[in-house]
Amino acid sequence: RGFFYQCTGEDDLSKLLDKEKINGYIGFDCTAESLHVGSLLQIMCLRLLQRHGHRPIVLLGGGTTRIGDPSGKDKTRTILSEEEIEKNIKNIEKILKNFLDIKDPKTKPIFVNNYSWLKNLNYISFLINIGKHFTINKMLSFDSVKTRLEREQSLSYMEFNYMILQAYDFLELNKKENCVLQMGGSD
C-alpha cells in the first residue's frame, strides 16, 4: 500500500502479472561506488517482483552514467573515467546480489550494462529511428527539465537527451530479454 507513486495501465499490468510470469527492470546509474538509501525502494521493487515469481532485470547504466542523470541536479555532473565507472558497476552489482535471490533459475536476476548497446550507436540512425518518437514539448514537461529551466540553471544537450537513452534502454531490454515492465523514479 502506497509503494508506488503512479502506474501506467495499472489494470492491464495487474491482469498481466496474474496471467503470466514477466521480466521487469530498474536501472541504476553507477556514479558512486555504492548505492544510497534512496535506492532501497527500487531494490525492494525488484525483490517484490522476484518473490512473486517474476524475473528482475538490473540495468547497470554504464552508458548513461557517462552522461549523467539530470534529475534532482542543479548542474551538470562531473564525467567519471571509464575505470571509475567499471569499478562502480562491479561494486553495485555485488551489493544488489545480496538483496536478490541469485540461486533460483526461474527468477534469477539478469544483470545488464547499457553501455553494451549505447557505445556503438550510430547518431544519425538513432535520430531518424528513435528521436522521431520524442517531442520537445513532452521532454520539456519532465520535472528534471522544468526545474532546471525555472531556476535558470543550464541544462546541456547531453543531459537533455538522457531521457531518450532511458527509453532506448527499455526498447533494447524488450528485444533482448523480453522485458515488459519498467520501474523507476517519477521522472
Predicted regions, residues:
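NTP-dependent nucleotidyl-transfer catalytic core
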Residues: 1-186
